[in-house]
From Swiss-Prot:
Species of origin: Rhodospirillum centenum (strain ATCC 51521 / SW)
Binding site for Zn(2+) 2: D65, H66, D212, H270
Protein name: Ribonuclease Z
Cofactor: how and how many bound: Binds 2 Zn(2+) ions.
Catalysed transformations (reactions): Endonucleolytic cleavage of RNA, removing extra 3' nucleotides from tRNA precursor, generating 3' termini of tRNAs. A 3'-hydroxy group is left at the tRNA terminus and a 5'-phosphoryl group is left at the trailer molecule
UniProt keyword Cytoplasm present: no
UniProt cross-references to SUPFAM superfamilies, sorted A to Z: Metallo-hydrolase/oxidoreductase (SSF56281)
Residues that, per the record, bind Zn(2+) 1: H61, H63, H142, D212
Keyword Glycoprotein carried by entry: no
Active site (record annotation): D65 (proton acceptor)
InterPro entries: Metallo-B-lactamas, RibonucZ/Hydroxyglut_hydro, RNase_Z/BN
Length: 308
């Protein structure tokens, strides 16, 4: 299961209702921050998610409304000694801007105690932890080098209740020990190993995150089948001409992609403050369900979607 915290859901400039792009993705002890718009540090503190174990930041692209918050956030991580190492993932273009921002603004005169690693992205899998694999895929937005991200839980085999019963493993302490230690010795002297009681492999939960985008149709295969898709929908469908001229998506674009790719749930973000969120959500629900329009500090659990 993934836990999402929407720290900034606005477009271009912050407003009274919305901060700029930032999404915290958590899975067990792993934490990934996708984009870091202006004011992200304040949003982190106000949202109560903290900065501990925040050692990976993924940049969709190098536009300032997605990256400017790096100065205060990374500077604070260094000042508070909250991490020994921080990895910034992004295109060459985005990382160049990030490096200039940090080297010339945050640390112009001294070397930070924080070890910052600049990891240049290419399409494909780029990060694997014990339980999560993250893949980058190209996204069209103006002339920028832009990426979206697909997060997938590692396939796992849980303990099977029927097998545990057949092996005579009582509920309670013995099953807990078997799950965590890998083996348990029963009262009759038999030793049961974890692999003897595993059920069939289960698909892990998946989600995709797309920042600014000018061509949703090109993303169908990249996001196909995910349990949840987070994607920008900066404009109402009535303003399609403006969306096209600015290389952004409409509500209809995002919903069409979700339908074509067979995603389980849809969350719309990067919202223009000109619209009433209730009207945006009503338009989206007429085109795809289940769907929600994210607000700052919304928290969403991502579990395997129930599909018809």
């Amino acid at each position: 299961m993934f836990q999402l915290t929407f720290l900034g859901t606005g477009a271009t400039v912050p407003s009274a209702r919305r901060g700029l792009s930032a999404l915290l993705v958590e899975h067990e002890t792993d934490r990934f921050l996708v984009d870091c718009g202006e004011g992200t540090l304040r949003q982190i503190r106000q949202g109560g998610v903290g900065v501990r174990r925040l050692d990976r930041i993924l940049l969709t692209h190098g536009h300032l409304d997605h990256i400017l918050g790096l100065a205060s956030l990374v500077g604070t991580l260094d000042l508070w000694d909250q991490a020994d190492r921080l990895t910034l993932y992004g295109s060459e273009e985005a990382l160049h801007i990030a490096r200039v921002l940090l080297d010339q603004v945050v640390w112009p005169d001294d070397h930070p105690g924080l070890d910052v690693i600049y990891a240049t992205l290419k399409p494909g899998r780029f990060c694997e932890t014990g339980g999560v694999a993250v893949t980058a895929f190209p996204v069209c937005h103006h002339e920028t080098q832009s990426f979206g991200f697909r997060f997938e839980e590692t396939e796992h085999r849980p303990l099977d209740g029927a097998r545990l019963d057949a092996l005579g493993v009582p509920e309670g302490r013995e099953r807990h020990e078997l799950a965590h230690a890998g083996a348990v010795t029963l009262a009759d002297g038999r030793t049961v190993r974890r692999e003897d009681a595993l059920g069939p492999a289960e698909r892990g939960t998946s989600l995709a995150v797309v920042g600014d985008c000018g061509d949703a149709d090109a993303l169908v295969e990249s996001v196909r089948g995910v349990d949840l898709l987070v994607i920008e929908a900066t404009y109402r469908t009535a303003d399609e001409a403006t969306a096209r001229s600015r290389s952004h998506l409409t509500v209809a674009d995002a919903c069409r992609l979700a339908q074509a790719a067979g995603v389980g749930r849809l969350v719309l973000t990067h919202q223009s403050d000109r619209y009433d969120p209730a009207e945006v959500e009503a338009e989206a629900r007429a085109r795809f369900e289940p769907v929600m329009v994210a607000k700052d500090f919304d928290r969403v659990e991502v579990r395997p979607a129930v599909r018809s």
